[in-house]
UniProtKB/Swiss-Prot annotation:
Keyword annotations of the record: Cell inner membrane, Cell membrane, Membrane, Transmembrane, Transmembrane helix
Keyword Cell inner membrane in record: yes
Positions of transmembrane segments: 64-84, 97-117, 214-234
Membrane topology field: Multi-pass membrane protein
Identification of the protein by name: UPF0283 membrane protein blr7254
């Protein structure tokens, strides 16, 4: 019978001893004779904690949407009944007045249908550009060659209405049949199509920031400043949307404004603007500018930051091959202009 070997007695050893081998718990190593194997225990605090999947929240009835839909339906019914009664009263008074009222009602209905159609087209166009941006970002990560060709074709359709991009479209179309990786194709499309648009967008943002800084520096009332900044911001967002292929109407502008504000909230744009203003105005520039000009510079920088966020939102391709415009460059131009005006 085989006798059991006695258990190993406690002993001391050095970790740098070549006869001591430290292995993980799941490793199986073939050790030589006289070699000591040490398997360290894992600290429970450092072990990964399994995260349970969050169950999707149960969505109830959209009472807010139902309320506004019902209110809009009742309003349309009331307006329709009022128009019908008005036309009936006009016919009762005079047949000619009835036909005139009927013609006005027809023109109003036709104009309303055109406005609704334009709003729907603008919303659909904005949704197309937004999805194109997301698809391009996915191709940059996955390098999908087939999907990149589809994105380039969709991008060429959007850019077809811009005569300034005729040469860029021809150059890009000549490369669509070549063997190019998906991510490289997206970068090529960005360099060819977005480069002139980015330069024009930077000019629009710089011009809007300078106008805001000048008007707010000379305006006598704070209410005028707020109103002008708001109008200038809306106009800038609309110009950038048209530049990059969007056609927003009233509802489209509301949607764009929400996206721009959300982008600023995510990226901390206002905080970045404040820190930049404090940094640049704290290096002796504040002493050179008067109080009103300093307020104008601040409003101009905030407008510029809003414009940069609008570029990110309205641009159909993410920044990959081209560097995004920086607030520091626009701030340098704005401050230099203000110094010249002060002198």
């Amino acid at each position: 019978m085989n006798e059991r070997s006695p258990p190993r007695r406690p002993a001391t050893f050095r970790l740098d001893d070549p006869g001591v081998v430290v292995t993980e718990a799941d490793e199986t190593a073939r050790l030589g004779r006289g070699t000591i194997q040490i398997t360290p225990e894992h600290d429970p605090a450092t072990l990964p904690v399994p995260i349970e999947a969050v169950l999707p929240a149960r969505r109830g009835l959209p009472w807010g949407a139902l309320f506004w839909s019902g209110l809009a339906g009742l309003t349309l019914l009331g307006v329709g009944l009022g128009v019908v009664h008005l036309i009936e009263d006009l016919f009762a008074r005079s047949e000619s007045l009835g036909f005139v009222g009927l013609a006005f009602a027809f023109v109003t209905a036709l104009a309303l249908a055109v406005v609704i159609g334009r709003e729907a087209y603008g919303l659909a166009r904005l949704a197309t550009i937004e999805k194109l941006h997301q698809r391009a970002a996915a191709v940059l990560a996955s390098d999908d060659r087939k999907e990149s060709r589809v994105i380039v074709q969709d991008l060429l359709k959007i850019a077809h209405q811009n005569p300034q991009l005729a040469r860029a479209r021809a150059t890009l179309e000549s490369h669509t049949g070549e063997i190019i990786d998906g991510a490289d194709m997206i970068r090529l499309a960005e360099r060819e199509l977005m480069s002139p648009l980015d330069a024009e967008a930077r000019r629009l943002v710089s011009s809007a920031a300078q106008k805001v800084s000048i008007v707010t520096a000379v305006s006598p009332r704070a209410a005028i400043d707020v109103m002008f900044v708001f109008v200038a911001a809306l106009r800038l967002i609309r110009q950038l949307a048209y530049l990059y292929g969007g056609r927003p109407g009233a509802l489209g502008m509301i949607r764009l404004l929400r996206h721009v504000i959300a982008h600023l909230a995510i990226t901390g744009g206002m905080a970045a603007s404040d820190s930049l203003v404090q940094q640049m105005l704290g290096h002796g520039i504040a002493a050179k500018l008067s109080q009103r000009l300093g307020e104008g510079v601040l409003n101009g920088l905030l407008t510029a930051r809003l414009g940069l966020a609008a570029i990110e939102v309205t641009r159909p391709l993410p920044f990959a091959a081209l560097p995004p415009p920086k607030l520091s460059d626009l701030a340098t131009d704005l401050l230099r202009k203000k110094e010249d005006e002060e002198e």
